[in-house]
Amino acid sequence: MLLYEALELCGYDVFFLDYSDKDHKMNPHPFIDNKKIIPWAEYRDSYNKKVDIVFCPGISANKELKDCTKLKNPKSKIVAVHYGNNLLSDIHEMLFKEEKRFYLMSPECNVDHIVYSPHYKLAKQYYECIERAPSSEIPYIWDPKFIELDAETRGYSLGYKHSEKPNIAVAEPNLNISKTCFLPIITILKLLEENPDKINNAAIFANIFHDEKVDMSKVKYWLANQTVIKKHPQRVFFDPRRAFSYILKEDNPIIFSHQFYNSLNYIYLEAMYFGHPLVHNSPEFKTYGYYYEKFNIIDAKSCILNAVENFQKDELLHKKAAKQLIRKYSIEENIKSINEMIERINNA
């Protein structure tokens, strides 16, 4: 959606290509209502305008799409858009998952260009090898309207409320090693051992603890019976994943995050937009919140204590940093970069 709006703001004629059929419908959304949408059958059979670039975010460009587009314009470019850390996730999928789902090195994967989010530059050579095409960065952009709409729909009024003993929330997806709750859990255990009076509760929002297909019984037993949680059974909760607006509203927490080669994250911007303390290890967001290096548990614990003791005092500084970062990743601030990306694609 944001890529569509960014391209539109740059002056390009943009449309969504809709593959919906009787079995697969395009998800309705208020922000799509006023967008140009062309059904696949119409695009294939009767759409006669020249298409210069087809962006494929999160999906593969199948042969039919490529052939159809090239027939309309032999110079058109099919562009794979990678917003995920495919290098790490594919290693995990290929080696450790029973169901093997990863990019295959076959001619069907071929595209004309690849764009990747800036924090996935480490995978540049990987993308170029599997897609057999040149690659470049796509600007990272964010807009608050999505979480604002979600909060409005739920009837929430969001905004951090200072507390002497705040809650902590961890909201990592745990889909692969790049964003997990592992280090935050260990840090929270350390905090409860050494400074139990500094926080109220900690909530780990992680579906893996509720997935019937994954046997977490030994982990649950260890946490409940062989760690400091045994002394604080009503202070650490393992809940299913929830909408981030729900977490902000119901827990009013310090957001505690850990990432591994996944340093740009919408929840960081959402947390700072609503004024929440953020404990994180993302170099790109170093100016906001409380930053710890890599896997440093001791520093992460110190950051939590720093947030508890000093966030209210330093609130104006955090607001200034938040404003600068939110501006940095806005569509308006990235118009030039978007145009430069289009130029790179066309000239490749």
Question: PLM ranges: what are they?
Answer:
Residues 327-348:
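C-terminal alpha-helical cap of glycosyltransferases
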